[in-house]
Amino acid sequence: MPFNAFGRYVGLMKLVCSQAELNAALQLVSRAVASRPTHPVLANVLLAADAGTGRLSLTGFDLSLGIQTALDASVEISGAITLPAKLLGEIVSRLASDSPINFLSDEAGEQIELTSSSGSYQMRGMPADDFPDLPLVESGTALKVNPAALVKALKGTLFASSSDEAKQLLTGVHLRFDGQSME
């Protein structure tokens, strides 16, 4: 499978995945998709299938927030494409949850056919090359956090965060780690 200069697969893509897992992943990454994008590709979600790992990776990125997740898939041919997040999410959410979803893209990576027991859909997307790369953390300290402690801390603070996108600074919570504890 050919790679582009950014290490992404290009060309044909063929895979089968679970509707329930894909729907959950789309709901997650769609939170990072721009509602009024400055560039058309930012309204899309990047789907990248890897036959070597048997995983389908989904990425949403609005140039300030990026979310990436992956799910198990039966990948016959590795490839990547970007598809309109809203439309893809609406289609996938309406498909039967007990039916697998088949994806087949064209050679150019601009159109995909999505097939399940509920029907067949054709979507036009954009090449994966057009999607911006997520920034990488170049320096920092890795840490392990007890998931239960993190959930407890977030539940105790998230009520105070704003849901108003106009006040972006207030939509999150501040976490501080001192090596032994989290605050």
Residue ranges: model-predicted function:
Residues M1-E183:
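Structural preference for solvent-exposed beta-strand-turn elements
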